[in-house]
Swiss-Prot record:
It is a multi-pass membrane protein. It is found in: Membrane. Belongs to the PMP-22/EMP/MP20 family. CACNG subfamily. GO terms for cellular component: monoatomic ion channel complex. This is Voltage-dependent calcium channel gamma-like subunit. Keywords: Calcium, Calcium channel, Calcium transport, Ion channel, Ion transport, Membrane, Transmembrane, Transmembrane helix, Transport, Voltage-gated channel. The L-type calcium channel is composed of five subunits: alpha-1, alpha-2/delta, beta and gamma. Pfam families: TMEM37 (PF15108). The chain crosses the membrane at residues 25-45, 96-116, 131-151, 155-175. The lineage of its organism: Eukaryota, Metazoa, Chordata, Craniata, Vertebrata.
Length: 190
């Protein structure tokens, strides 16, 4: 039976209570900020140039030297940093999984708002939990990158793409916590 057919059979007296404007506005802001975090994280992972140290540019996907002319190597072993090739593979994988978890979390949040049924509260909670998982993966990738290149790291050496990933990770955390909090306020656990 279609959704229209189910609603047509529902008696008029059993209408679900409408959400307040404030609650809908907050949930919309959370969804919008998560979408921004997904875009920031995706661009940051795809570009991957995260650290400029002296005349070397370290990225998730390749390593470049910028002496007279820029020469890039896909073989990260050419950077002469122990464990960089294997470590960057792990950082890339964790970062990509963080983006995937954030996309699924965003999908759950949006579906819970578009299809208001008895399961929409569970969908909102699942979306928020997936955002927390995405935050953990994203911050783990950032931390792994910094640990791998700890000898080359300076605060001004981080590129815009690194700070995009950092901001995306922070936004994922804030929105996951906000999503769980607004859900606990509006729908107390039974």
């Amino acid at each position: 039976m279609t959704a229209v057919g189910v609603q047509a059979q529902r008696p008029l007296g059993q209408r679900q209570p409408r959400r307040s404007f404030f609650e809908s506005f907050i949930r919309t802001l959370i969804i919008t900020c998560v979408a921004l975090a997904v875009v920031l994280s995706s661009v940051s992972i795809c570009d991957g140039h995260w650290l400029l140290a002296e005349d070397r540019l370290f990225g998730l996907w390749h390593f470049c030297t910028t002496t007279n002319q820029t020469i890039c190597f896909r073989d990260l072993g050419q950077a002469h940093v122990p464990g960089l090739a294997v470590g960057m593979g792990l950082v890339r994988s964790v970062g990509a999984l963080a983006v995937v978890a954030a996309i699924f979390g965003l999908e759950f949040l949006m579906v819970s708002q578009l299809c208001e049924d008895k399961h929409s509260q569970c969908k909102w909670v699942m979306g928020s939990i997936l955002l927390l998982v995405s935050f953990v993966l994203s911050s783990g990738g950032l931390l792994g990158f910094v640990i791998l290149l700890r000898n080359q790291v300076t605060l001004i050496g981080f590129t815009l793409m690194f700070w995009c990933e950092f901001t995306a990770s922070f936004l994922l955390f804030l929105n996951a916590i906000s999503g769980l909090h607004i859900n606990s306020i509006t729908h107390p656990w039974e």
